[in-house]
Amino acid sequence: MEDGVAGPRLGEVAEAVEARAPRRVTLRPFAPFSAAAEGDGGGGGDWSFIDCEMEEVDLQDLPSATIACHLDPRVFVDGLCRAKFESLFRTYDKDTTFQYFKSFKRVRINFSNPLSAADARLRLHKTEFLGKEMKLYFAQTLHIGSSHLAPPNPDKQFLISPPASPPVGWKQVEDATPVINYDLLYAISKLGPGEKYELHAATDTTPSVVVHVCESDQENEEEEEEMERMKRPKPKIIQTRRPEYTPIHLS
């Protein structure tokens, strides 16, 4: 790397992409900063504090997939338009795979290596496809070390009762006192059917706000049924006459 060179230059990134470097990509400065550095006599200017080793980026840390946005809806339903869309990216990597998300109107393009993804991103970003300006963004890379979930931390797995083998520094947890709002209970106890409750007292400019607690419909219906039951006349039971007894020998 030349003296005074310390940031990424877009043109040289494209050259590095075309060269298909096997392991690492070296980022160089943007043109405005490199020109300023050359004007200072090659001393680096404001970029002299950057270590050249920090400019080397491992390819494993670069994304190998891009997300295509602002696409024509025909890409998701028309097979011919879809084949034309895929051919744009297969020129950079023949092993490219595609994932279509119709509801999000986006397509994920998976490349076999990060260099192909960077090459397609540089050349196809903001290009016109089917009358719309297509935009490409790098997909976020995820590095999962293990396919299993990590166990939870053991600091909150103990109950209030002491465990069989308490760890060092473990202490008994005391039950918290229940919180009781006595003001609310007192206000509720004062309420009753048919009584009023003044929420806000009246002032010189505002009226008072009073709440009248009404009886429930079920209680009213029960009272009406009880009143009707009391008003009904009691049924009179008529006693039947006992049949006269006639001896058998007289019949």
Swiss-Prot record:
GO terms for molecular function: nucleic acid binding; protein phosphatase inhibitor activity. The modification Phosphoserine is found at residues 161, 165, 216. One of its GO terms (biological process) is calcineurin-NFAT signaling cascade. GO terms for cellular component: cytoplasm; nucleus. Residues 216-251 are annotated as: Disordered. Transmembrane segments: none annotated. It comes from the Eukaryota. Residues 216-227 have a biased composition (Acidic residues). Keywords: Phosphoprotein. Coiled coil: none annotated. Belongs to the RCAN family. Interacts with RAF1 and PPP3R1. Interacts with PPP3CA. This is Calcipressin-1. It comes from Mus musculus. The gene is Rcan1.
